[in-house]
Amino acid sequence: MLKNEHIDCGKEFDWGLASADYAKYRDIYPNEFYNKIVDLGYCKGGQRVLDLATGTGVLPRNMYKYGAEWIGTDISENQIKFARELSRGLDINYIISSAENLDFPENNFDVITACQCFMYFNQSVLFPKAYKWLKPNGHFLIMFMAWLPFESELAMESEKLVLKYNPSWSGRGMTRYEVTAPEMSKSLFDVANTVSFDIDLPFTRETWHGRIKACRGIGASNLNTEEILNWEKEHKKLLSLYPEHFTIPHYVTILDLKCRSNG
């Protein structure tokens, strides 16, 4: 179980509880997202990449074709179990560990990635370690993708239903924001690039239901089995009011931090 006073009012959560749904329904990043990363010059052939809080290995698996050497890490044993199963036939090394407890040699990676997870880290511990692990002029990519509930009736109604069962869930109400460097990074890293864009992602009733169930407010929460089943019944009833196929607007951001030279 994880716990952070700034997330969900300090309630415990565990992504390992949601791993099966996470593996099935959260591999939804569009090709445009991966292409943006490659266009910036990262996660390509000849590079060593460390993916922090890799979950079920979504980023390494989808970017493996670009030729980089990947290591994926996650604190959840169950997440890593699914990552390994989904990565069969791919030469990706997975490690069970929190980001803060990892230990690698200096100058070991060209790129470090953190996708949809940066808010969970202890930044005062992680940034000095990341700086040490990266090669000179190495890059730390912090990425995020969120649905926009104020621009989608269905997304808003889904959020309301999550909050009905888990009022402490703080992952709601996302809006566009300016991409800026975290304060803790500024002594070690400079901003090399910022990227942000909107995209409409396609869903069916089933895949949107699965995506919401796999969020921190339901599948990874401490709700009991009966509560989750009741939520599922209500959410499926809500979805029956909408077409079988639809799109949900999302906002994507990439923050590219470059190691500051000591020279």
Can you name each region flagged by the protein language model?
Residues 100-111:
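A short acidic, Gly/Pro-enriched loop at the edge of an enzyme's catalytic core
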Residues 1-53:
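Conserved class I S-adenosyl-L-methionine
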Residues 131, 135-201:
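Conserved catalytic/acceptor-binding region of the Class I
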Residues 56-101:
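Class I SAM-dependent methyltransferase SAM/SAH-binding core
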Residues 124, 179-263:
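Conserved Class I S-adenosyl-L-methionine
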Residues 111-115, 123:
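A short beta-strand submotif of the Rossmann-like class I SAM-dependent methyltransferase core
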Residues 121-130:
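A short, conserved alpha-helix within the catalytic core of class I
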